[in-house]
Amino acid sequence: MILLLAGTSDARALAVQVKKAGYDVTATVVTDNAAIELQRAEVKVKIGRLTKEDMTDFINEHGVKAIVDASHPFAEEASKNAIGAAAETAIPYIRYERASQAFTYDNMTMVSTYEEAAEVAAEKKGVIMLTTGSKTLQVFTEKLLPLSDVRLVARMLPRLDNMEKCQQLGLPQKNIIAIQGPFTKEFDRALYKQYGVTVMVTKESGKVGSVDKKVEAAKELGLDIIMIGRPKIEYGTVYSTFEEVVHALVNQTRS
């Protein structure tokens, strides 16, 4: 069996590809919605966040031969847990990650953390749109909501827990954009104009995450961009295509 951390839409497509290559695959996802397309493709699914101990137990109980970590580029804890579990059980760890993109824009500020992004946003002021999801929303609400010269607008997935979190953090309903992509450049541009955005905050999650569309639209309107770089994790070899992952599995799981 292969344990595959499927934290993104392309990761779930990878799980299907690995199954088609003849492997018994169990994919891990965090939400019920993420499990649906995998279940339709008859891929076994385990729902919920796994600790290192959870992964280690699963590996031992099910005779897992390798971990394929296709979690989101910013799912730092999940990757560290997978690396630790693979090391503890002496099985191969294979990392799949969306290819990075290089952007050139005078009004783009690169930062390393969400906290740093919030600091820069506070300095820039104006109408700030977050496209970084709900997980780290509190970092921005604590820093930006008290400022009278800042309007904080947050775009996130239309999930009940996200709306509840916005309410708990005091983000006004009129400043919540609950919607699911992917989005075109034209859509992003219209959204920026509708809200009068002056600063867009995003993270370098790759082309599949439509970061390029967000950036292109922002550049056309002359907006300031704050880009959060990917976490620095020692993955070892990183593969960016499905074919490379399957080839690595073939080479590393031979008896």
Swiss-Prot record:
Alphabetical GO biological process terms: cobalamin biosynthetic process
Enzyme class per UniProt: oxidoreductase
Pathway: Cofactor biosynthesis; adenosylcobalamin biosynthesis; cob(II)yrinate a,c-diamide from sirohydrochlorin (anaerobic route): step 7/10
Reactions mediated catalytically: Co-precorrin-6B + NAD(+) = Co-precorrin-6A + NADH + H(+)
InterPro entries cross-referenced by the UniProt entry: Precorrin-6x_reduct (IPR003723)
GO MF terms held by the record: precorrin-6A reductase activity
The enzyme's E.C. designation: 1.3.1.106
UniProt keyword terms in alphabetical order: Cobalamin biosynthesis, NAD, Oxidoreductase
Family in the record: Belongs to the precorrin-6x reductase family.
Its biological purpose: Catalyzes the reduction of the macrocycle of cobalt-precorrin-6A to cobalt-precorrin-6B.
Record-given protein name: Cobalt-precorrin-6A reductase
Organism of origin: Priestia megaterium
Taxonomic lineage of the native organism: Bacteria, Bacillati, Bacillota, Bacilli, Bacillales
